[in-house]
Curated annotation (Swiss-Prot):
Pfam families: His_biosynth. InterPro entries: Aldolase_TIM, His_biosynth, HisF, IGPS_HisA/HisF, RibuloseP-bd_barrel. It catalyses: 5-[(5-phospho-1-deoxy-D-ribulos-1-ylimino)methylamino]-1-(5-phospho-beta-D-ribosyl)imidazole-4-carboxamide + L-glutamine = D-erythro-1-(imidazol-4-yl)glycerol 3-phosphate + 5-amino-1-(5-phospho-beta-D-ribosyl)imidazole-4-carboxamide + L-glutamate + H(+). GO terms for molecular function: imidazoleglycerol-phosphate synthase activity; lyase activity. It comes from the Bacteria. It is found in: Cytoplasm. Its main location: cytoplasm. The lineage of its organism: Bacteria, Pseudomonadati, Pseudomonadota, Gammaproteobacteria, Enterobacterales. PANTHER family: IMIDAZOLE GLYCEROL PHOSPHATE SYNTHASE HISHF (PTHR21235:SF2), IMIDAZOLE GLYCEROL PHOSPHATE SYNTHASE SUBUNIT HISF/H IGP SYNTHASE SUBUNIT HISF/H (PTHR21235). This is Imidazole glycerol phosphate synthase subunit HisF. GO terms for biological process: L-histidine biosynthetic process.
Length: 258
């Protein structure tokens, strides 16, 4: 059995780490490189960086900080933000990233997933899915351009359909960003995770809602996700990664202990 992964998420805007609630009202957390090093030192399995306004602004993630992060950490990291071409991805990988993640650009051009997977291998290609539960319809829908409140829109895709589509096109991993739960710290949406797990054959990463160590345990034990991504509980030092891993190991979760 592969070890479960603990993955801090760093949302980046204008060279700094930000954090919002339900993808709104972002506050500044701090500088990118010191936070990345802190999480690596605490025992994170990997890091994810989202340049949250790159896609909506029509630009590619700023690559200067990618190189600086690669210099100070020795764990894998994934970068996302406005990647629309093989050339965009190649440059980010050449600066030291281990994976690239695409979200809104994949919705605009689903063939991008296949082209990137064919060029770099599926193990390198992550697809992020921003999913919102609509109380009126009782369905989960995929959103696009969520880094900009003024441009966020609901797409025609229901979440489960898009999960299956991106796998067919070559996604090697899926990060499910559950927008309703984002930043509120009352637990992952286990109902949605279980539904996605049933149709997801590639590694599945839960994102949105972690507030306690028990929430991580529930995601691993009840929804069988491969990794759990979180931001505010780590940024605000509510949970220490080393202590979290010790707790999970004590509960029987296969986890890498530093």
């Amino acid at each position: 059995m592969l070890a479960k992964r603990i993955i801090p998420c760093l949302d980046v805007r204008d060279g700094q780490v930000m954090k919002g609630v339900q993808f709104r009202n972002h506050e500044i957390i701090g500088d990118i490189v010191p936070l990345a090093k802190r999480y690596a030192d605490e025992g994170a399995d990997e890091l994810v960086f989202y340049d949250i306004t790159a896609s909506s602004d029509g630009r590619v993630v700023d690559k200067s900080w990618v190189a600086r992060v690669a210099e100070v950490i020795d764990i894998p990291f994934c970068v996302a933000g406005g990647i629309r071409s093989i050339d965009d991805a190649a440059k980010i990988l050449s600066f030291g990233a281990d994976k690239i993640s695409i979200n809104s650009p994949a919705l605009a051009d689903p063939t991008l997933i296949t082209r990137l997977a064919d060029r770099f291998g599926v193990q390198c290609i992550v697809v992020g899915i921003d999913t919102w539960f609509d109380d009126a319809t009782g369905k989960y829908h995929v959103n696009q351009y969520t880094g900009n409140e003024n441009r966020t829109r609901v797409t025609q895709w229901e979440t489960l359909d898009w999960v299956q589509e991106v796998q067919q096109r070559g996604a090697g991993e899926i990060v499910l960003n559950m927008m309703n739960q984002d930043g509120v710290r009352n637990g992952y949406d286990l109902t949605q995770l279980k539904k996605v797990r049933d149709v997801c054959r590639v590694p599945l990463i839960a994102s949105g809602g972690a507030g306690t160590m028990e929430h991580f345990l529930e995601a691993f034990r009840d929804a069988d996700v491969d990794g759990a991504l979180a931001a505010s509980v780590f940024h605000k030092q509510i949970i220490n990664i080393g202590e979290l891993k010790a707790y999970l190991a004590g509960q029987g979760v296969e986890i890498r202990i530093c």
